[in-house]
Amino acid sequence: MTSGINYVAIVLYLFTAIGIGFFLLKVREMYQRISAGQSDPARFLKKRERAKLMAKEILLHTRMLRFTGSAIAHWFVMIGFVALLGTLITAYGQIIEASFVIPFIGTWTPYRYFVLAIAWTTAVGIVALIGIRQATRFFHKSRTSRFLGSRSLKAYYVEATILAVVICVITLDYLEHQYYVNATAVQTVAAIKIWVSVMWFIVISSDLTMGVAWHRFLAPFNIFFKRNIDSRPALGELPEMISHGKPINFEDPKEDDVFGIGKSADISWKGLLDMASCT
């Protein structure tokens, strides 16, 4: 452990504190924007059923099964986003001491192979999604493409970040299990992993319209508060028209009742959540 590595560790810890602080401020700002929407009390009914539906749709990707190839790839990337969190925690210890592992589970062989399996499947998944998006972009240029008119730079950045993180995870595992461990190499890759991860938080915090990244945090809430808590799609029959959180009495409407959406202030908070999580 050299003074140079100590210096790098201090810088990365400060960088992380700034990045997470900025991220939390922007989460608060997004919450304020969404909560400023019109009331929709029905979204808070039957919380237990909603929680079950959310878990089912997230874990099984039931709404994406019709896109079999991309659904499987997306599922692995989603799992990797959560399951590889432990490797980021490990990296913060490794920039000080290359042999650092998470207490209790860090030396457990099944955990090591679990992380490796998730890292490799996430890598394959994100490469598959990149390939699918590029193929769709080049071979379906008509309005049938869901990417028509979209800006690709943000998607490229998210894809590159995910790929860089899993490459770091796989590389670190290789370096950690050499007969002669190169401490400098381990600490360097761990530092890169931290920098890439924190930079991602800073970039998405700088753009609250970056739904391709924000949906990773917002999707569970979007599913939990969906209109129907069964298999029916939201784009079915028209819902009861409400104003200020209450059904409109068309026989005797109030003077301040809002019929439909005439301006952004008329959008419900759920509608604003939908737009924020749109990819």
PLM feature spans:
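Membrane-embedded alpha-helical bundles of multi-pass integral membrane proteins
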Residues: 1-269
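Cysteine-centered iron-sulfur cluster-binding motifs in ferredoxin-type domains/subunits
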Residues: 270-279
